[in-house]
């Protein structure tokens, strides 16, 4: 039995400062039938804390956030998960005195005016690969001394930005 040697593959992990876009290599189809975007490229072109969708499955989205400085406070309508992809991010959590600030039926999270009333739950200092639960009934705030990138798993909300035509590959990748 003959053993085939695998192709040499190199895994490269990008960052906000250094990434290779990559792309879908279409054999016999149309690139528009596939979704491909680069989270670091999307974050590099976004304003701090814009919630840009980079993945979607029915009402669920993966949003890319450019972390830079201090965000406003937000309250999720359902549990959300923040995965740090680049940089160091401080996530401040507090248990809301009034969880009713998020109306029933809301999807995603809501921006809150100022610092909401509540009990401090703690602070998470997360780096690349760390995931943090952002629980319903709490409020959260991000802080990054240096620019970073967070992927946020949530439901598409009123401030989810969908830029599919801008961020997705729409033509075959050029061959070398």
Predicted segments, located by residue:
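Ligand-binding loop in jelly-roll beta-barrel domains
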Residues: 119-131, 136-160
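Short, conserved beta-strand element in jelly-roll/cupin
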Residues: 76-97, 106-112
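His/acidic/aromatic-lined binding-pocket segments of jelly-roll/cupin-type domains
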Residues: 72-74, 79-84, 124, 132
């Amino acid at each position: 039995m003959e053993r085939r040697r695998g192709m040499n593959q190199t895994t490269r992990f990008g960052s906000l400062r250094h990434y290779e876009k990559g792309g879908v290599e279409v054999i016999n189809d149309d690139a528009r039938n596939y979704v491909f975007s680069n989270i670091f490229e999307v974050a590099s072109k976004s304003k701090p804390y814009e919630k840009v969708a980079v993945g979607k499955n029915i009402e669920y989205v993966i949003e890319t956030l450019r972390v830079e400085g201090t965000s406003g406070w937000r309250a999720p309508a359902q549990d959300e998960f923040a995965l740090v992809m680049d940089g160091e991010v401080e996530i401040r959590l507090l248990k809301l005195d009034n969880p009713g600030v998020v109306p029933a039926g809301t999807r995603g999270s809501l921006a809150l005016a100022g610092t909401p009333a509540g009990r401090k739950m703690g602070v998470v200092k997360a780096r690349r690969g760390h995931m943090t639960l952002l629980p319903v009934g709490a409020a959260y705030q991000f802080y990054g001394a240096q620019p970073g990138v967070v992927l946020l798993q949530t439901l598409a909300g009123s401030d989810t930005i969908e830029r599919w035509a801008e961020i997705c590959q729409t033509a075959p990748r050029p061959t070398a």
